[in-house]
Amino acid sequence: MSRFAQIFDEVLQEIIPTQQEIQAIDNIVEELKQHLKVRAIELGIKYTSMEPQGSTGIKQTQLRDDFDVDFFIGLDITQFEEKFKELSKSKLKQESKQYFLHLCNEWIIRSLKNTKFQEPSLFYAEHPYVRAIYVSDGNEVHVDIVMYLDLDLEYIKERGPITSVDRSPWHGLFIRDNLTVNQKNDVRLLKQFFKACHCYGDKSALGRMGFIGYSAELLIYYYKSLESLFLDFNNLPNNYLDFYKRSKNQLRKIMHMREDPLIIIDPIDKNRNVASAISLRAYKYCNHMISQFIQDPKVEYFQISPLKELNIDESHPLHAKAFIIELVNNNADVHYTINRDKLYSLAESIKSLGEKEVSHEKRFGSIVFELYFEDSTQEYNLAFYCEQPLISKTFLRKGPPIKDKRHVERFKEKNPDFVKKAKHLWVETTRDYTEFLKFLDDLVNEKLPDNFSLINIAQSSKSKTTSAKKALFVLIHMVLPFLDHPAQ
């Protein structure tokens, strides 16, 4: 028995779903099928399959208390192609959205009217789907009903999917058929570990996206066991996990994979890197925690605890360099991923404009940010580290090379107080901003998305909400220690 086995076994006792939970999901699925079949017959709708996908479906890699159901309905691609046979693949994709929208409204939502599936509503990812709530034994089960085009595996491998969810049933079959029961338990342990690190899914506290379920499943598939993965996790960026056995150079020649920090190729689609969206920050923090676990294995590394709050006072070494933006979302209908992406765009703009003047000279120096949000309270926070929050009123702006006579004369006319330095002309220029906090305030008020209200922009010591204090903890204790920048 390995030195980790006892820990793994102890954790598994707490996270493997109970038979009662599994049976409850099975009952919900059967009830859903019956409602959908009745309406399908009425409308003359033909489908190829109806079954649950994801971890609670055919994969069976879910954690205890994971009651969400991803229910997939396959549509016959031959009928679909006959209807839209003259369209290109991109046009076919667009038309499929309209067709799926029609089926969501006329088939799925109407099927669930006056049933135990409450509040069936339209949601949108790449194309429309329906979400409903089913209460079972006091637990709210979110049921997502998703349609896809039932494509042959060879079609996907040769031409790719028409919509991204067309791969999903094949993902389920691959995991079902290629992981043993013990390996599926290793997947559960890995998911639990990522969640304990707050680095799982699209609500990851670090980066825009953490590790996802399918990436965890494939990591166990490629490494064979959780122990093997943990012992080599530090080398993951250098290990190109490719079902198709291509070399590093071959993979890096694929344009959309050139900059991806991690490579985990989808066995179903050779052109898809499952790890493309996983934040390097999430990897680095998980790598640190795995290293700690290897040195001193404890059950506590798998226990999910709330993020800590960081109360910063003037004695803290980063007191003057850490800042917080506290926001509240006023429109609960806007999905958190949309809000996340909007605020990432705002923060990237702050970073870009804050690090350099318009003329590219250094401004406030290195800027690092992290977004932390709590969907349940609609609170969103951007925490910033700024290398030089107070800077001089003027700076030397670089002009043309001295040898460029035509541009030199024009520069001299506009800037009679020029100086010569390092083979260029320079001129002392007044800055628009000398205080990072003022710069932050103006830019946020100019660019903040309309659905947000501003609660607070301040130095870190003046944060107000508990979620803001958590954002500061994430930035200072989970992000900055693992980045190469002046704070270290």
Regions found by a protein language model. Name each.
Residues 182-348, 352-369:
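Conserved nucleotidyltransferase catalytic core and NTase-mimicking acidic/glycine-rich helix/loop elements
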